[in-house]
Amino acid sequence: MTELKNDRYLRALLRQPVDVTPVWMMRQAGRYLPEYKATRAQAGDFMSLCKNAELACEVTLQPLRRYPLDAAILFSDILTIPDAMGLGLYFEAGEGPRFTAPVTCKADVEKLPIPDPEGELGYVMNAVRTIRRELKGEVPLIGFSGSPWTLATYMVEGGSSKAFTVIKKMMYADPQALHLLLDKLAKSVTLYLNAQIKAGAQSVMIFDTWGGVLTGRDYQQFSLYYMHKIVDGLLRENDGRCVPVTLFTKGGGQWLEAMAETGCDALGLDWTTDIADARRRVGHKVALQGNMDPSMLYAPPARIEDEVATILAGFGQGEGHVFNLGHGIHQDVPPEHAGAFVEAVHRLSAQYHN
């Protein structure tokens, strides 16, 4: 494989010295970029874009042509696994993702296959291989998956949800069925991420978007337990290099200590967590990624710079920080504001590394 020219993102995840704080943005390949909209129109629809390796590669690389980002992230969707299980994923205008055949009971769970990463999900691996080739070693490639709990919420609710009553009903009335589903998903995610690593992903991230809707006890049992199983089963070295793992539970700032016990290398923080407090609590054990409010990118560049300075000062001197937003970039953010953000992180962070 090509020698990596910029490895500061991987070094920061392993709490090794870097010259400046690395930065990337969740959803950095997305609708705020006019070139993304043009490529998506060419593909026809979102899943066609995901399933075409050349176009998925093109949109992955688009933000890197605009900004000096320190990592690329695979362009895909967290719902690829449930789609490959046969739930019939489709996208409703203004409604987000929906499934034609949601999971309603234990019998439904028992029928679900564990998808073959090089079979039904082979298009994802083709995209990973294509992106790695086209990156030419400029920056590392991040692979990812949704967490078992987060995938289960979509599968049981039949799509996006605000109250999560359907899956919580299953959790409290038929926990055995939910545990069976989560166990299948944990096995599927482990296979899926390991296949991404073998195909060329140099770091992986598990997105637990909806873990924060659970009580502390339920989070441990129904979300964290299964993420821990995945971390235990992941390839942690490939191509002679360590493959770092990041866990991100949105709304999970109160559980950082338990998350750090999983053996992951880094924790993603949303914008509601104080990064100085997070570093005091778990910085001796894991790197931290985050955590500017994505809405700050609507502000004038000078205000964005102030916020970057505040977060850098909050983390303080030394290693183990990857700068990011606290969640995905919004689709109507001016692209030049994202550029001001990336530039400010690199310029203002040098003083914290010596």
Curated annotation (Swiss-Prot):
It comes from Salmonella dublin (strain CT_02021853). Belongs to the uroporphyrinogen decarboxylase family. CDD domains: URO-D. It comes from the Bacteria. It catalyses: uroporphyrinogen III + 4 H(+) = coproporphyrinogen III + 4 CO2. NCBIfam families: hemE. The gene is hemE. Catalyzes the decarboxylation of four acetate groups of uroporphyrinogen-III to yield coproporphyrinogen-III. This is Uroporphyrinogen decarboxylase.
